[in-house]
């Protein structure tokens, strides 16, 4: 899997955590063998060493992942963990940054409908394609453009929305479109057959129609970046926004999201903001293929309404995150 993807490409193998080179401004391929416990412990140790060395150890770098598991579990979850950790050290990730190979390789079965090859050969083919996309990835900075903001929280009581407005007041060079997803306004995806979904997607629509077709999908299509405002509901993304993510398939069928960046504002009453951030990584970067900029999320703990304003250094953190957004929207 690894050999076939890096053949004829100059590379450096890093496997000694006590002799780590400078990994800033590099193309990084994270390779993991997920064991019975669901982790690649040596890779976790390497990432821990990088954090210990410098929390900005991966600034300016872009990553992708090849992950193999001894069974049919753990690849996707561990990928989210790696991306989350590396992203918090300044690493960005291309859209669809992962090729995962479960123990049985059955996860490649659906590919056989379009690629008439043995499962193992499909694995090698996709791995090679991923590394090629990583190597040629050279996005350009965008100094002005459009940002769509999706949220479902009520205006009067939302710490998440308040935090976003602390951030957005510093963003002046981009046009911002805030879209509230009201309760029950977006029905979840019913899983239309592929051809039917493709049919509606080509017409810039969806079987259900409604606010998704009239407002959300056109806004995302026109935007250079999408900011997701996610209060932590039981360590999960709010149901309304989950429905939006699921319904993006209609647009995704028609064109990829590789040139669109995602950011997140996550507020928890207690803990668990990392759980929500990882779900966004899994759904939007790994599955749907949005670009993941470095330090893509700002996270805070605030329970009662308006207590976000009492969080230590929140104004400084908000202004810093606004610069993360404006400096990392690339096409």
Language-model regions, residue ranges each:
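Hydrophobic pocket-lining residues within nucleotide cofactor-binding pockets
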Residues: 181-184, 232
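FMN-binding flavodoxin-like domain, especially the glycine-rich phosphate-binding loop
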Residues: 1-175, 217-222, 228-230, 235-331
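Cysteine-cluster motifs in flexible loop/terminal segments that predominantly coordinate metals
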Residues: 184-217
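The conserved SAM/SAH-binding core of class I Rossmann-like methyltransferase domains
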Residues: 150, 179-182
């Amino acid at each position: 899997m690894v050999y076939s993807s890096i053949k004829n490409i100059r590379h450096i193998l890093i496997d000694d955590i006590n002799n780590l080179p400078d990994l800033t401004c590099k193309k990084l391929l994270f390779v993991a063998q997920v064991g019975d416990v669901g982790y690649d412990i040596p890779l976790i140790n390497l990432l821990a060493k990088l954090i210990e060395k410098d929390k900005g150890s991966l600034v300016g770098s872009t990553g992708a992942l090849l992950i193999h598991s001894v069974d049919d579990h753990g690849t996707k979850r561990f990928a989210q963990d790696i991306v989350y950790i590396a992203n918090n050290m300044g690493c960005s990730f291309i859209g669809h940054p992962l090729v995962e190979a479960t123990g049985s390789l059955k996860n490649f079965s659906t590919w056989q409908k379009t690629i008439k090859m043995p499962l193992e050969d499909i694995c090698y083919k996709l791995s090679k394609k991923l590394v090629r996309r990583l190597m040629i990835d050279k996005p350009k900075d965008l100094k002005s453009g459009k940002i769509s903001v999706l949220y479902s929280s009520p205006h009067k009581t939302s710490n998440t929305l308040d935090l976003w407005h602390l951030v957005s007041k510093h963003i002046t060079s981009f046009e911002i479109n805030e879209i509230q997803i009201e309760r029950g306004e977006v029905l979840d995806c019913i899983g239309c057959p592929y051809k039917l979904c493709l049919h509606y997607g080509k017409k810039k629509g969806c079987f259900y129609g409604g606010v998704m077709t009239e407002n959300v999908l056109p806004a995302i299509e026109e935007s250079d970046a999408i900011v997701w405002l996610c209060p932590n509901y039981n360590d999960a993304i709010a149901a309304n926004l989950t429905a939006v993510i699921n319904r993006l398939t209609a647009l995704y069928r028609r064109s990829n999201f590789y040139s669109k960046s995602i950011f997140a504002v996550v507020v928890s009453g207690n803990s668990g903001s990392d759980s929500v951030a990882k779900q966004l990584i899994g759904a939007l970067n790994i599955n749907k293929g949005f670009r993941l900029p470095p330090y893509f999320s700002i996270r805070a703990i605030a329970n009662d309404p308006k207590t976000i304003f009492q969080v230590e250094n929140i104004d400084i953190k908000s202004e810093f995150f606004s610069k993360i957004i404006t400096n990392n929207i690339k096409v």
